[in-house]
Amino acid sequence: MYVAMIIRKYFLIIALLVMPWLAIPSVSAADKGWFNTFTDNVAETWRQPEHYDLYVPAITWHARFAYDKEKTDRYNERPWGVGFGQSRWDDKGNWHGLYMMAFKDSFNKWEPIGGYGWEKTWRPLEDDNFRLGLGFTAGVTARDNWNYIPIPVLLPLASIGYGPATFQMTYIPGSYNNGNVYFAWMRFQF
């Protein structure tokens, strides 16, 4: 019940952030800057998804060089949870996705996150089902220890995938005893 309430609350916030982008008219490629390209990609992913995705958080790892041992001994590094999204591949073969996910954070409290992700995709083998990706995600999260105040995030993404299954990951930078967390999940396309 509590998790559903948090997800609904943040879905509404993200929807309010995304909806204005959907109203932006398309302009010619010559007139586009990075922001218009970004908003057009978000809008197209919202309006014309090719796939629906299931996200399953797999691991969080706190960089041992950046934490006191007594802290890492107490932290949760098994972020069970679930997420859903929609995605598409563009004409260059790059991945675009919109997602919402909720998982157990380092303190074993629920953390919702939602946003847009993009990855430049390489297919280095003859088998086009195998792929590697590098990109970013821009979104909003909220944490119990910050009173669930919405926090914008801009993080790197990397992935390795085969067919409909992708192992996707990010690194949350930080200072000593804060941040410096590797977070990874499985993404299944339907």
Swiss-Prot record:
Q: Which cysteines are joined by disulfide bonds?
A: none
> What's a Gene Ontology MF term here?
acyltransferase activity
Which residues does UniProt assign to the signal peptide?
A: 1-29
Active-site residues, as the UniProt record annotates them: H62, D105, S106
Keyword presence, tRNA processing: no
Q: Which GO biological process annotations does it have?
A: lipid A biosynthetic process
Q: Where does this protein reside within or beyond the cell?
A: Cell outer membrane
Q: Give a Gene Ontology cellular component term annotated to this protein.
A: cell outer membrane
Q: Where is this site: Role in lipopolysaccharide recognition?
A: K71
Q: How does it assemble?
A: Homodimer.
The role this protein plays is: Transfers a fatty acid residue from the sn-1 position of a phospholipid to the N-linked hydroxyfatty acid chain on the proximal unit of lipid A or its precursors.
Which family is this protein grouped under? Belongs to the lipid A palmitoyltransferase family.
Tell me the protein's name: Lipid A acyltransferase PagP
Origin species, per record, is: Salmonella paratyphi A (strain ATCC 9150 / SARB42)
